[in-house]
Amino acid sequence: MKKVLLTLLLALALPVAAAEAQNIALGERVPEVKVPAWLRGGKPAATPRLTYVEFFHSSNPACTASLEQLRAITDKLGAKLHVVVVTRENEEKIAPLLSPFLSRHISVALDTGGRIFSAFNVQYVPFGVLVDSRNRALWMGNSLQLTPEIIEKSSK
């Protein structure tokens, strides 16, 4: 009986915990990505129609896999999408890993103080948020699940 009650209690608590896992809601404005430094000075020049904010940490192999996928997506979508990779790690540590991903469509924000991670209340990585030109969340979740089709569908 105790196991049944415990299981029931956990089942009821999980959706509440998941709902508060990230500090954003679809259709609502998200915090701005304001950082003091960008890897190799790669601050985005202009705000494109869509921006994907990707939260990254080098200790997670899935983060690197998600960057490979995001590079393929930006190659396909071109100027429609700009990816901002946000990391709390210092430049010396992540530069060798992230520099190969830098392009006209991918920038790396150095959030060493963790302000952006905190503003979005990021609880796991890889995690990302697709944002429109008015800074509203269109999609969020595990970056490995993001596809060009989801981006096209979300932006209509």
Where are these regions (language model features)?
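Bacterial N-terminal signal peptides
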Residues: 7-15
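Structural microenvironment flanking redox-active thiols in thiol-disulfide oxidoreductases
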Residues: 64-101, 116-118
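Positively charged n-region of N-terminal signal peptides that target proteins for export
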Residues: 1-4
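Short pre-active-site segment immediately N-terminal to redox-active cysteine/selenocysteine motifs
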Residues: 49-51, 56-60, 124
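N-proximal helix/coil linker or "cap" segments that precede and/or mark the start of modular domains
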Residues: 15-32
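Short, internal strand/loop/helix patches
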Residues: 84, 100-129
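A short beta-strand-turn-helix
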Residues: 29-51, 68
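Thiol-/selenol-based redox modules, centered on thioredoxin-like
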Residues: 130-156
